[in-house]
Amino acid sequence: MSVQTEREDTAAGHQRMPRPTEDWQKQVARRKRIQFAIWAIVVVVIVGGMWWPLLGFVVPIVMLAGIIGGFFRGRYVCGWLCPRGAFLERIVGRISPERPIPQWLRRPAFRWAVFAALMGFMALQIAQNPGDVNHWGQVFVRICIITTAIGVVLAIAVHPRTWCSFCPMGTMQSAVGGSRAPLMIAEGCVECRACERACPMNLKIVGQRNPTPLPPSPSTERGRAVVNAPDCLKCGECVVVCPKRVLGL
């Protein structure tokens, strides 16, 4: 595709099918390396935070990074840079039965109730001694312990990313940028659902296509449809396993 054509396509508001599958294979491998490099952070915060409470400030830093990132790429931070998500997916996931995540856990009412409960708990705890920075750190460590424990139990009983389906920060990211960098399906999908089996969030993909198709991609000349999946982690696992190479981010 020429630079001029690419600019015209962008100016017209068209979303193009991006990287080829071979490139996404490299991206998926890179994501895996990143996850193995950062998963131990959650263990350091939980264990080390008992003696050094200031380690707890890693928690709000990750939370803030997730919210800011959400405005640009939805739940990208969840899928690539969240230490707990990496821990649940790569470490605890080895002993998970990988059962389907119950759909009621994804319902907005439940998710926002969890968000309100967690934020309320954090505010009440901090209010007990708001002038002590170490107390703030202890509160963050306590929250990390509680939520990670819930995540581990759910991962062992159901699916590695069960907690992530209603994680308060994930909910925020979905709310502010769930439509950013969307997953797209080009013409030629045979509905084999290999993408859904590979998805770490256990998302429904094939049946969530936007009924209004996008204009054909200049690079492939195939029509495309945006997948309505605000909880997509932008991990590329589905892109790599697609036998027809019709998926893209």
Regions found by a protein language model. Give the residues of each.
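Non-ligating segments of multi-cofactor redox enzymes
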Residues: M1-P215, S219-R222, P230-L249
